[in-house]
Amino acid sequence: MLDLTNKESESSDNGNSKYEDSIDGREVGTSKPFKEERSLEDLQADLADMAVWMEGLDATKLPLNDPQLLCNGRAFSEVLHNVDKNFFTDGWLETMPENRTTNIMVFRSCTRKLWRKMFDYVNHINRTVVSSRWTDIHERIDGIYESDLPAMVNLGMAVVTLAHIGKNAKRFVDYSKALTSTHKSMMSNVAKMVTTVIDEMPENPCFHEISELHGSQSELNSLSESSGKLNGNGSSERRSNADQILVDAELEIERLRTETENQRKEIERLTKSFETAQHDMSSNSESGDISILEKQNEELRQKRRELEEKNLELDAAVDQFKGIVFELTNENDVLRRSDKERQRLQTVLDAAQSDLDEWKTVANQYQKEAELSKQQDKEIKELLSQNKALKSRLDHHVKSATLEDANKNGIAQLRTQVGGLTALNTELKASLDSKKRCVEQLEIQLIQHKEKVKELEDRKDELIEERNRLENQLIFKEAVTPRSLHESMFEAGNLSFEPFSEKNTLPLEIENKRLTERIQELESLEPLKGELITLKSKNGVLEEEKLFATKQIEELQQQIEDLQENLLKNQEHASGDVVGLKIQLEKAEVEAQQMREAKMRAETNQAQVDEILKKRTAELEVNATALQKAKAVIDELEYNSRPVSEDSMTSVQAFKEMKEENEKLRQKVEKLEIELNTVTQGFEQENRLLTSASHQQVLNRSIDEVMSMRAHAGSEEPQTLLDTQKMSGALPWRSLASETRRELPTAMASILVLGFLVFIAWMFININSALNAPPNA
């Protein structure tokens, strides 16, 4: 695999480097590094054309024409995943970051990771890289526009080319043909870039060509290196490939030896036949036979020379195979020693894997406990909401009870007022009744007096008429009858000597006396009329007082009825609220008991978690020690198997083996880090949940105490509203302070454990960075 992490390495698995090899078809010598001859405008146009081609695949939603956004490799990874999903798998795609950052180190790491996978795919499709364009990509990534644009254009060219030469090449070739009809100029530029990259990635020779190793030494070396490259995917696989090569070489040597022996036997046979022919020539003197024998002799000599040349070539091949066998034997010994170290490291990794399985089990337990904690948290939240509702209702009931007390006092005052008004109403009714009776008596007397007055007036009218009549008669008589002097004198002396006149005067006098008496009676009735008028005025005043008292009585009765209705409603509402409040208080007590039990379970779980955490901390320390030892062994192996100069024996296979094992260990460490982060986050979340639950339980406990005191308040002395409010406001803070003092050691222990976990994570990050550091040459 091409090593992009080591800038000082001058060789790769396929023999390509800054120096040209004989396999490139060029002379051996130093070559200049790749230089981009295109301008920035041309590169931007090329990237835009390739972006149009890749966007037509609908493989990604990320932008493909911005070089800075392409540096994280996610967009190219999604396109490659569409090119060959069997090689560029979903698991590998998930390892490519999706975040956008401007960190140059992240850019370089993502570019190296993407190119390593692309280079593996190039080997997978039996091709090799022969241009220095691809060996210094990391050198052109430094986070500025003028340098990351060429690198992203080159990677885009490689992605488009791999689509046209990969396993699913037919589909993408058809897609390009269909796209040519609408984007001719763009596809022409893309075709040029694909042709350039295909020339720089020729196909590899097959392994069966090793039978033609009678060629030059450089061809043998290149073939051996390419075979090592094609079969270098692990220490066990490389060792099996080396053993297979050694067996094939030994078989080839045996075959060559057998062929050499057969050729020697053929030479001896031909020599004997030549001697026999010479002996026959001495006995046979015919010229025709001699010429034939000479021709045969010449042919035999020519064949002998060819066989001798071939024998020399086979001897050279045997010597060459001896050197190869010696190198493979040494490499096999190194591989065996490395295999022992690998087995030892494998044992350590197996132990780490078992620890990882245990961690996974613990993580699953933590996850289950976290789910239970979430459920408990939901229940606690529901209980808190119910508690708040009950508390609000309790406050409402307290306020309503206070209002009811005030209403009761008002009702008592109103009842007192109603009693006074009722008594006053009774007195007024009694006085009214007495006055009514007086008025009735006065009315009766008035009626009687009115009747008498009417009778008297009638009698008076009759008498007046009678008097007037009599006066008229008297006047008439006087006018008709003349009087004598004697009568005049008699009248003057009030003497009457005539009996007739005495008879007429006597009734008149009697009537006159009667009238005089009647007049006197009437005059005596004048005070009664004044009294009657006075009684009438008093009667009017009493009537007005009666109406006012009746109206006031009706208003008081209406107020009494309203107050009685309000009193009944308040009594019914208060009785219903008291019953509901008692039920809710009982429910709250049951829920408080459940929460106390949940707190006990949580404390038990906390103790268990602390014990498990202590055990896992000790195991983490052991694993960290084992990882330090593994790192030391890896560093020692890398130091012992580092590449040396070209003119002495190298140990590239051992270096590749250590590098791959380092990669595996790095992946293991990353997995362990992920597991550690998951466990740490779960532990932190549990700590937060437990802390919040403990604080909430302290508050609930104080609320329960207040509610219990209120529930038992009926058996104690009655308290005023001000005392109740002071007590409900003072007790929760006192209990909260005491509970806070009790929970403070647990919080400090949680903080210490969290700090220790952060230190473990920091140590794993340092180990990972040390494992990923490039080896020194």
UniProtKB/Swiss-Prot annotation:
Q: What happens when the gene is disrupted?
A: RNAi-mediated knockdown results in a reduced number of viable progeny following incubation with the DNA cross-linking agent cisplatin.
Region listing for Interaction with unc-84, in residue ranges: 749-777
* GO CC terms in record: centrosome; cytoplasm; microtubule; nuclear envelope; nuclear membrane
Q: Where is the composition biased (Low complexity)?
A: 218-235
Q: Please list the GO terms describing molecular function.
A: dynein light intermediate chain binding; microtubule binding
Which superkingdom is the protein from?
Eukaryota
Where do the segments described as Interaction with dli-1 lie? 1-234
Which residues are in coiled coils?
236-399, 425-688
Q: Which residues cross the membrane?
A: 747-767
The protein's matches in SUPFAM superfamilies, at most eight in alphabetical order, are given as:
Hook domain (SSF116907)
Q: Might you name a Gene Ontology BP term for this protein?
A: centrosome localization
The subcellular localization recorded is: Nucleus membrane; Cytoplasm, Cytoskeleton, Microtubule organizing center, Centrosome; Cytoplasm, Cytoskeleton
Tissue occurrence? Expressed in the syncytial gonad, oocytes, and in all cells during the development of the early embryo.
Residue ranges constituting the Calponin-homology (CH) domain according to the UniProt record: 44-169
One further remark on this entry is:
In contrast to isoform a and isoform d, isoform b and isoform c contain a potential transmembrane domain which may mediate insertion into the nuclear membrane.
Domain note for this entry?
The large coiled coil domain is required for homodimerization.
Family membership:
Belongs to the hook family.
Assembly, per entry = Homodimer. Interacts with the dynein subunit dli-1 via its N-terminus. May interact with microtubules. Interacts with sut-2. Interacts (via C-terminus) with unc-84 (via C-terminus); the interaction is direct.
In UniProt terms, what function does this protein have? Cytoskeletal linker protein, which is essential for attachment of the centrosome to the nucleus. Required for dynein localization to the nuclear envelope. Forms a LINC (LInker of Nucleoskeleton and Cytoskeleton) complex together with unc-84, that may be involved in DNA damage repair.
Q: What is this protein called?
A: Zygote defective protein 12
